[in-house]
């Protein structure tokens, strides 16, 4: 272990990374809500500090593309991958400089379609209990919109409208929208739940068109009009050279999952209803495919004393839970080793990390990530600390997986910066 790893991780007091009160939904960042999104100001500041000139940027857990958008409007060639098909769809829409004339023509066509008589639904989701999650009138109107979407042949237009449709599905469903996991509204609230499907869609489209206008202006003023590349590879298993060549990336900016989907953010459950309506692949298996989705059989040692001690403490309380947590760190370590291979010498890796609790035990993810990078020839540059005033997270969660047992969620994040030797 290097001398760097023994030093306290701190931030210069005057260097504020909290961005309290900042506008986080500018440009195409307004397109779609998503759990635990990194705010664009963090990515923008990291790019300005560590990659001010156009280069190649990678986000190996890109989610809805926050860092990719910020890189693209600064002239970077951006690459992102994510295992959640809905996240990739949202990213694709946010990164597409769609011509406004084509969009407005399509919007006029959609408006005419919405005003036309609603026919018999031709295609309905089969992977969910439809009448449990949606009222009959909502199903009818969503199917009407979906039929129009199926007529679109342009990939960029289809992504734009599909993203607005996705949020409409979620907001007009019987699911609680204040939860990441899939819970039905209580009966009392259901009785008062009369969503306006077409009105909701129109509002999303107006908002997203305004965001697109901002994005197009920023993209046009970039040092160069670069390209965005979205991939579907699993960085835990490897990064194909055909997608990203070894030692070709100058900067990595990412916010990996806080932990496995069992008790942290269940991205698959959050996406499930939209994914079914959009007929996205593997909608029911997303959470299991993410890091830590498959528990280990034995508790390993990670050679990070604080992490190993925390896992042993959790194991003494709940062996199953400890093995789930350990699986996440094993996958994270493998992913970092693969990411390291595509970073050029002197390249920078910036990881925005939250240290969560499981069974009341604080897990030192920042220390673990630093150690994992040090074992693949990176050195620690700095770690900035920030409060979390504006990331969409629940105030309390159930880190023990026991009903009624809750704990406070993370209120701070570490921004770990490493450099490849």
Language-model segments: residues:
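S-adenosyl-L-methionine
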Residues: 1-53
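Conserved proline-anchored active-site loop of SAM-dependent methyltransferases
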Residues: 43, 57-74, 78-85, 91, ...
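Conserved phosphoryl-transfer catalytic core
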Residues: 85-152, 270-300
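SAM-dependent nucleic-acid methyltransferase catalytic core
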Residues: 139-254, 259-265
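SAM-dependent methyltransferase catalytic-core segment centered on the flexible catalytic loop
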Residues: 258-338
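Conserved helix-to-beta-strand junction in the class I
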Residues: 335-345, 376
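Core SAM-dependent methyltransferase catalytic element
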Residues: 344, 399-421
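Conserved S-adenosyl-L-methionine
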Residues: 378-389
């Amino acid at each position: 272990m290097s001398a760097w790893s023994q030093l306290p991780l701190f931030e210069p007091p005057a260097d504020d990374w909290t961005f309290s009160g900042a506008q986080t939904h500018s440009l195409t960042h307004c397109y779609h809500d998503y759990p635990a999104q990194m705010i664009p100001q963090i990515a923008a500041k990291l790019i300005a500090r560590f990659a001010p000139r156009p280069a190649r940027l990678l986000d190996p857990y890109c989610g809805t593309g926050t860092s990719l958008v910020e890189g693209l409007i600064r002239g970077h060639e951006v690459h992102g991958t994510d295992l959640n098909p809905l996240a990739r769809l949202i990213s694709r829409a946010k990164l597409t400089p769609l011509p406004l004339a084509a969009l407005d023509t399509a919007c006029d066509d959609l408006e005419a379609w919405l005003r036309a008589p609603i026919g018999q639904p031709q295609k309905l989701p089969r992977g969910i209990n439809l009448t449990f999650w949606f009222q009959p009138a909502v199903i009818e109107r969503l199917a009407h919109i979906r039929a129009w979407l199926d007529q679109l042949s342009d990939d960029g237009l289809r992504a734009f409208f599909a993203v607005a449709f996705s949020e409409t599905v979620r907001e007009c469903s019987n699911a609680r929208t204040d939860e990441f996991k899939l819970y039905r509204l209580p009966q009392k609230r259901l009785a008062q739940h009369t969503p306006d499907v077409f009105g909701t869609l129109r509002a999303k489209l107006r908002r997203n068109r305004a965001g697109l206008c901002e994005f197009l202006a920023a993209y046009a003023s970039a040092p160069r009009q670069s390209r965005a590349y979205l991939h579907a590879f699993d960085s835990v298993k490897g990064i194909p050279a055909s997608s990203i060549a070894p030692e070709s990336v100058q900067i990595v900016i990412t916010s990996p999952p806080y932990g496995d989907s069992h008790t942290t953010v269940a991205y698959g459950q959050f996406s499930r209803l939209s994914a079914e309506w959009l007929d996205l692949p593997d909608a029911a298996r997303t959470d299991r495919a993410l890091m830590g989705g498959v528990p280990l059989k034995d508790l390993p040692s990670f050679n990070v004393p604080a992490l190993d001690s925390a896992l042993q403490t959790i194991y003494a309380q709940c062996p199953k839970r400890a093995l789930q947590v350990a699986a996440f760190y094993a996958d994270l370590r493998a992913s970092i080793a693969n990411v390291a291979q595509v970073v050029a010498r002197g390249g920078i890796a910036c990881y925005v990390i939250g240290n969560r609790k499981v069974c009341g035990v604080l897990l030192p993810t920042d220390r673990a990530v630093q150690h994992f990078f040090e074992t693949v020839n990176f050195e620690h540059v700095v770690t900035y600390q920030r409060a979390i005033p504006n990331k969409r997270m629940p105030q309390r969660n159930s880190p023990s997986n026991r009903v009624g047992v809750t704990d406070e969620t993370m209120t701070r994040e570490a921004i770990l910066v490493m450099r490849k030797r």
